[in-house]
């Protein structure tokens, strides 16, 4: 059986609209939603080989605030090489915003208005196209609910924006 991700990819191919621009031809759908349960995600990750060790190392480097691309390369991660020697306005910067937000949530115990915006800001020194992520933390019946909207810098290549609820 085809998983939900492949089903929506099939919808894009079969009934998606076509857009031509200076970067080529893309197919897309509007107003579609892909909801994935933990089982769906497990199915996706288990059905494809992924570099789990590299992803874990990369996340650890992000969380440490590491910006030197050479450190990522030492961990066997070379997909940031195109950025130059230093990651500017990227994931390590984003992770720095989380501790103050977590402290605010613990201090104020507010049900809403707990969010952080990650934006490849215009005018800021950057070696990457802007990405946009908005992460909102809500407290619902004593449990933490996370909603995240993410638009990749690769959106111009036809990659989707994603909304996650965890």
Predicted regions and their residues:
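Terminal, non-catalytic protein-protein interaction segments that mediate quaternary/complex assembly
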Residues: 1-166
